[in-house]
């Protein structure tokens, strides 16, 4: 508890945004004596970050150090600015990767983006902390990806399951075999739903599969370790499952994942991720049943959060006020399809303008006037989530 009290006092003294939050709720750092006392602090919802940061750039006065003292600054869709301090393994994913068997002697293909998004560096730093060699492959270009995988004898993969599925397709098209041309024996998936079908495909190829859960803001939150059901909560943060309306903890039902970090440079305390989960029965406070959905208008597509406000902003500026976006998963690949009502057709380059904002390439389709009702949701998730039976 001393560590928690220390970071709360430090945040109150050095992060004006957090001080305002406590003062508004008439709370003093000395009021927080136990983890249970954290409930006194209002949840800071992730969806508020763009507004807070816009009013006080770049971090909404939630950072306890100057931007110039950070190692890197990233921009996630929202936009949301995320800092990285000079601390090694800042996002604390090494414990998850260690549980997945990554370490010295491994050559790991990191297919998360190194451009603006923190995901690439997030796993790069964790892998280096474990002594693994990292190939900063980034996203896209599957032909080059599998060539590197073959030539360098890559042993591990970090990225999304959908992209690895594409790489397996490309490998099969080449006629390459595990143990002969391809030596990947372990994968760590995050940022997307992992289906049992994809898990089986990997295992059929002699590849051990692990998944993890984290966010750009909080880093590692939970991960698979094969020692129990669901995902093990990280040892490096306090994780609560809370009622989205009241912020109170719940023990036997779904709720929002709320995280408190011990990071003194960017002390996110009672941070509401917007993700829904629940405790695994019999493992309350220790294991969660993965991500079961979202409580806000943000939907994760190909590892990126897409928000209704972002889509509306782009489409309204281009003269398309009536639309509906739907997220589906076909053959293991997330797709963002947008139905648009227009009497004049769709402007060339519209898809690119949307992609520039949400970082996901959409499929656009013209639809008849009146087919989208006024009260229809603008952004729907039609994917079939395979809930963990734990």
Regions found by a protein language model. Give the residues of each.
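Nucleotide 5′-phosphate-binding alpha/beta core
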Residues: 1-99, 103-104, 332-337, 344-375, ...
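Phosphate- and divalent-cation-binding pockets in alpha/beta enzyme and binding domains
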Residues: 17, 21, 166-167, 197-198, ...
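Active-site phosphate/ATP/adenylate-binding loop shared across adenylate-forming ligases
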Residues: 36, 44-205, 228
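Short, well-ordered beta-strand segments
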Residues: 107-110, 258, 339
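A polyampholytic, Gly/Pro-enriched intrinsically disordered region
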Residues: 154-163, 230-238, 382-390
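AMP-binding/adenylate-forming catalytic core of the ANL superfamily
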Residues: 157, 262-360, 376-377
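Conserved AMP-binding/adenylate-forming
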Residues: 185, 194-283, 297
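Beta-strand->loop->alpha-helix junctions that form or flank phosphate-binding loops
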Residues: 210-215, 327, 365-366
């Amino acid at each position: 508890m001393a560590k928690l009290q220390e970071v709360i006092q430090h945040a109150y003294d050095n992060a004006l945004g957090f001080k305002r939050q406590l003062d508004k709720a008439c709370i003093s750092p000395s009021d927080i004596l136990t983890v249970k006392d954290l409930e006194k602090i209002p949840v800071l919802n992730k969806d508020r970050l763009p507004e807070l940061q816009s009013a006080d750039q770049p971090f909404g006065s939630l950072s306890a150090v100057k931007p110039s003292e950070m190692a890197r600054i990233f921009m996630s869709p929202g936009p949301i600015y995320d800092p990285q301090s000079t601390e090694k393994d800042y996002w604390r994913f090494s414990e998850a990767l260690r549980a997945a068997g990554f370490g010295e002697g491994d050559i790991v293909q990191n297919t998360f983006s190194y451009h603006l998004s923190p995901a690439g560096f997030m796993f790069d730093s964790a892998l280096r902390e474990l002594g693994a060699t990292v190939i900063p492959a980034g996203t896209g270009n599957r032909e080059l990806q599998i060539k590197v995988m073959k030539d360098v004898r890559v042993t591990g993969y970090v990225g999304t399951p959908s992209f690895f599925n594409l790489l397996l397709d490309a490998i099969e098209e080449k006629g390459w075999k595990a143990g002969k041309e391809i030596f990947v024996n372990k994968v760590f998936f995050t940022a997307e739903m992992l289906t049992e079908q994809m898990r089986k495909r990997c295992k059929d190829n002699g590849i051990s599969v692990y998944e993890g859960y984290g966010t750009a803001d909080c880093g590692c939150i939970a991960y698979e370790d094969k020692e129990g059901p669901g995902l093990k909560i990280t040892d490096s943060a306090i994780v609560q499952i809370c009622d989205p309306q009241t912020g109170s903890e719940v023990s036997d039902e779904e709720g929002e994942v709320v995280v408190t970090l011990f990071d003194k440079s960017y002390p996110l305390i009672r941070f509401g991720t917007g993700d829904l989960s629940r405790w695994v029965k019999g493992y309350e406070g220790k294991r969660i049943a993965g991500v079961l959905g979202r409580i806000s208008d943000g939907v994760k597509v190909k590892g990126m959060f897409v928000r209704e406000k972002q889509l509306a902003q782009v489409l309204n500026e281009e003269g398309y006020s009536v639309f509906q976006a739907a997220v589906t998963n076909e053959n293991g690949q997330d797709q963002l399809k947008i139905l648009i009502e227009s009497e004049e057709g769709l402007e060339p380059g519209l898809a690119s303008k949307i992609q520039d904002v949400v970082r996901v390439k959409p499929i656009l389709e013209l639809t008849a006037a009146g087919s989208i009702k006024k009260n229809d949701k603008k952004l729907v998730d039609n994917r079939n989530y395979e809930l963990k039976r734990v």
